């Protein structure tokens, strides 16, 4: 549960002094961070999660300090210009004592996925920063059970045909969602039960189809798919938990109630339309057209040569976001943004294409024995909003080309 957050100043509390590493349970991790949920008895940390950065030998202390400043500026000042604070979680930056930090990471190593264990170097220098976040899976309501769904919706739009290169890609990329292309490329399915275009459509029936498809993918994958996660009473559950009757609510009744909660919450929220606009407006000409602009400016260099794409600074990022919010559709005009601005915009669009929605509500056991949603308890937050390295654009372009070409080779023009 990363930090799409409303930032709070770095003052007390101090997890290293106030808690034991064993008070924190592993939740999940991404490429650069691990997230923990507080399981101890302190009211100060109740309903809190802790996100820590993995130590890496490849990051120099000075570069890490600059990166910390950039990420801090992004959380505190820049991100809230793009997403309203009611969609962001609150957060507080904390400094962790080195021995406590290392003990925390060593303690959870046994439960971490094997594919995530490489790249951590406990000898790496640098400060040990963490971010205290809202634990959106937990509940302080007596007598009510917190239920939550985490959705990673992915790309909610199709690119404009006039900007697609080469011509062979047009019939594919303008009709087949990026999610379907990627699923087919990975060997999963060319017709998955879930399509983001349905979820982002705003049409109730299509949105219901999307949610049913996400349930299906979750069940088929035995809960391993990262597009749909289910939490009950602060714990992530699996399809086995549901099928084996390990929940306080019956399986069929639970699925029905949570699907309706999710659908109603998303329909009354502006989260999906806003994310779609950010995805599309920050990626207005498709990466294939952006690659053509790069090649025109640097004809003797590889596409998106990382040596020609310096890291973005906090000042530069803030400046571009101000340009963007002054005219969000400006990128559709080829004479508006510079190449550098378009690359920054694309890196920002990648954040909103890969973020997650967290829908939460509370169920209470009524006197008639039926579990009912507590009125007004539903909410939606946007999480997993970390900045992505701007140099990743070379990898993104390569992936884009691979997925549509594989579809063409295996399925034809559409």
UniProtKB/Swiss-Prot annotation:
Entry domain remark: The EXKPK motif is conserved in inositol-pentakisphosphate 2-kinases of both family 1 and 2.
GO MF terms, alphabetically ordered: ATP binding; inositol-1,3,4,5,6-pentakisphosphate 2-kinase activity
GO cellular component: nucleus
PANTHER family, A to Z: INOSITOL POLYPHOSPHATE KINASE 1, INOSITOL-PENTAKISPHOSPHATE 2-KINASE
Motif (EXKPK motif): 150-154
Name of the protein this chain belongs to: Inositol-pentakisphosphate 2-kinase
EC annotation from Swiss-Prot or TrEMBL: 2.7.1.158
Signal peptide: none
Biological process, per Gene Ontology: inositol phosphate biosynthetic process
Protein family per UniProt: Belongs to the IPK1 type 2 family.
InterPro entries: Ins_P5_2-kin, IP5_2-K_N_lobe
Class of the enzyme per the UniProt entry, highest EC level: transferase
Coiled-coil zones: none
UniProt entry keywords in alphabetical sequence: ATP-binding, Kinase, Nucleotide-binding, Transferase
Catalytic activity: 1D-myo-inositol 1,3,4,5,6-pentakisphosphate + ATP = 1D-myo-inositol hexakisphosphate + ADP + H(+)
Function: Phosphorylates Ins(1,3,4,5,6)P5 at position 2 to form Ins(1,2,3,4,5,6)P6 (InsP6 or phytate).
């Amino acid at each position: 549960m990363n930090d799409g957050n409303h930032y709070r100043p770095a003052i007390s509390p101090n997890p290293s002094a106030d808690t034991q590493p064993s008070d924190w349970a592993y939740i999940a991790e991404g490429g650069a961070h691990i997230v923990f949920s507080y399981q101890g008895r302190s009211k100060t940390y109740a309903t809190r999660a802790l996100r820590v950065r993995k130590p890496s030998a490849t990051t120099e202390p000075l570069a890490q300090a600059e990166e910390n400043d950039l990420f801090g500026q992004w959380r505190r000042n820049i991100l809230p210009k793009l997403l309203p604070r009611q969609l962001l979680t609150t957060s507080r930056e904390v400094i962790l004592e080195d021995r406590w930090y290392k003990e925390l990471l060593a303690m959870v190593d046994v439960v971490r996925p094997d594919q995530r264990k490489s790249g951590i170097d406990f000898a790496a220098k640098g400060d040990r920063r963490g971010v205290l976040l809202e634990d959106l899976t937990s509940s302080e309501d007596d007598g009510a059970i917190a239920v939550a769904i985490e959705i990673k919706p992915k790309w909610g739009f199709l690119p404009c045909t006039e900007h697609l290169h080469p011509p062979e890609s047009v019939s594919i990329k303008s009709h087949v969602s990026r999610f379907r292309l990627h699923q087919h490329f990975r060997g999963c399915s060319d017709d998955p039960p879930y399509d983001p275009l349905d979820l982002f459509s705003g049409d109730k029936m299509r949105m219901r189809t999307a949610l049913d498809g996400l349930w299906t993918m979750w069940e088929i994958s035995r809960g391993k798919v990262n597009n749909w996660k289910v939490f009950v009473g602060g714990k992530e559950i699996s399809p086995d938990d549901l099928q084996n009757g390990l929940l306080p609510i019956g399986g069929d009744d639970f699925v029905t109630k949570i699907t309706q909660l999710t659908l109603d919450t998303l329909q009354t929220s502006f989260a999906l339309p806003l994310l779609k606009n950010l995805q599309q407006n920050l990626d207005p000409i498709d990466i294939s057209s952006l690659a053509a602009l790069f090649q025109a400016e640097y004809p003797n260099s590889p596409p998106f040569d990382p040596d020609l794409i310096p890291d973005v600074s906090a000042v530069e990022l803030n400046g571009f976001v101000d340009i963007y919010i002054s005219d969000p559709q400006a990128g559709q005009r080829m004479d508006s943004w510079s190449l550098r601005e378009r690359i920054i915009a694309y890196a920002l669009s990648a954040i909103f294409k890969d973020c997650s929605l967290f829908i939460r509500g509370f169920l209470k056991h009524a006197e008639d024995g039926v579990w009912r949603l507590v009125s007004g308890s539903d909410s939606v937050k946007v999480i997993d909003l970390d900045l992505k390295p701007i140099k990743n654009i070379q990898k993104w372009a390569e992936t884009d080309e691979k997925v549509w070409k594989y579809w063409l080779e295996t399925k034809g023009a559409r």
